[in-house]
Amino acid sequence: MHIKKGDNVKVIAGKDKGKEGKVIATLPKKDRVVVEGVNIMKKHQKPTQLNPEGGILETEAAIHVSNVQLLDPKTNEPTRVGYKFVDGKKVRIAKKSGEEIKSNN
């Protein structure tokens, strides 16, 4: 998967199209990512010992990785991801600017 935790992405399809956020978690087996502030779902929580009031909580739900695009670190525009070997290590590069993408976990 070309998106990693800590990456800044833009949603390119779906109900939250146009929103930007940071990737909180990746789910590689399901090809999904959880993005901060995107795809907010309401979860009805029963009262428990930890949360005696219960109520309705809002949390981010996962969206398919094909619906997000990585933001170029140089221009802050959506870009595709390429790979290049630098000093024997495989690194991700932004296709638009050629800039190396560093994951900031």
Swiss-Prot record:
Cited Gene3D superfamilies: 2.30.30.30
SUPFAM superfamilies: Translation proteins SH3-like domain
UniProt cross-references to InterPro entries, sorted A to Z: KOW, Rib_uL2_dom2, Ribosomal_uL24, Ribosomal_uL24_CS, Ribosomal_uL24_KOW, Translation_prot_SH3-like_sf
GO molecular function: rRNA binding; structural constituent of ribosome
Domain of life: Bacteria
Gene Ontology CC entries for this record: cytosolic large ribosomal subunit
Database matches in SMART domains: KOW
Presence of the UniProt keyword Cell membrane in the record: no
One record GO biological process: translation
Keyword set, alphabetical order: Ribonucleoprotein, Ribosomal protein, RNA-binding, rRNA-binding
Function: One of two assembly initiator proteins, it binds directly to the 5'-end of the 23S rRNA, where it nucleates assembly of the 50S subunit.
PANTHER family recorded: MITOCHONDRIAL RIBOSOMAL PROTEIN L24
Quaternary state and interactors: Part of the 50S ribosomal subunit.
Family, similarity comment: Belongs to the universal ribosomal protein uL24 family.
Protein name: Large ribosomal subunit protein uL24
Taxonomic lineage of the native organism: Bacteria, Bacillati, Bacillota, Bacilli, Bacillales
